[in-house]
Amino acid sequence: MTTSTGKINLLGLTLAEMEQFFDSIGEKRFRAGQVMKWIHHFGVDDFAAMTNVGKVLREKLEAVAEIRGPEVVSEDISADGTRKWVVRVASGSCVETVYIPTDDRGTLCVSSQAGCALDCSFCSTGKQGFNSNLTAAEVIGQVWLANKSFGTVPAKIDRAITNVVMMGMGEPLLNFDNVIAAMKIMMEDLGYGISKRRVTLSTSGVVPMIDELAKHIDVSLALSLHAPNDELRNKLVPINKKYPLKMLLESCMGYMSTLGGKRVLTIEYTLLKDVNDQPEHAAQMIELLRDVPCKINLIPFNPFPHSGYERPSNNAIRRFQDLLHHGGFNVTTRTTRGDDIDAACGQLVGQVNDRTRRSERYIAVRQLADEPQDSAARP
């Protein structure tokens, strides 16, 4: 992609695209691999640092290309070790990237859009409205920046980032081409060399793009379900009105059937007090997913201002999990991480220059709802 400087940003190019770039400037294709290693293995953003690239070629690259990642605005570290970066992208909006360390892995949660157009009712990102898709460089740039922050050089040795989940701000499948390119770089040996089993794309259910996915890439798939029936899901996840559950699950199963091995669909389900956490919801979920090879990840709601929802009690969470277990499912409840720095699931907001004006409308409605009503003034 050409940036505002008129130069090609090499950060977001796949290996095939990098080879095409070197063809276009009259250079041999093996240079693509050399430059990719410098960018992604070593975090280099200066052609002068590429010591196995000749001076003449370095000067040529300097004239027509650049390596530009998103700008880090802030970095916060939680008491539990979770890190959150706020990064500014070309549109002027800010998005958030979260790193979650555990004993056996380090998971990076990556954003795909500045804001989100889907307006899921329990997600703070959706309340920010939508500005733009991130470029491939801005998506993979979050991995690049995080890797540089850890000082892991090269990226594939003693790596801090073992897993990447496309679960940050935005709906990845509504930024299809750029997300596909970024995930290819994540898995490319000359990029970050992350196993396809350790790269997960999460979707709220853009059925045509799920159907298209297998033609382009092989990664793990997670479905943001959040409701066991169409009536409730229409309210929580409005895209369900266009792509209802039967159609959605058939699409997911079609994609999963193309993958090798014993890989299963991950079901994400945010538990909302008295909304979708009752025994009847668990029973409906068991029936809905009976023939779907899957694992279920329960996510207790992480509150944000004026959300209108509450987190269920620990007893209600355990009850729901136990009911699903007894129904024969592999179920885990996600431990809340990074909530003290607003980095928990559903809390990512960034700073979005909202083209939909949804955030203005949302704030106005919530303020009206919070105002005390004068009963004497009512008819």
UniProtKB/Swiss-Prot annotation:
CDD domains: Radical_SAM
Span of domain Radical SAM core: 102-342
Residues where [4Fe-4S] cluster binds: C116, C120, C123
A GO CC term assigned to this protein in UniProt: cytoplasm
Single biological process term from Gene Ontology: rRNA base methylation
EC category name: transferase
Top-level taxon: Bacteria
Signal peptide: none
Main location: cytoplasm
Cofactor: [4Fe-4S] cluster
Disulfide cross-links: C109-C345
Family of this protein: Belongs to the radical SAM superfamily. RlmN family.
Protein's name according to its UniProt entry: Dual-specificity RNA methyltransferase RlmN
Organism: Pseudomonas entomophila (strain L48)
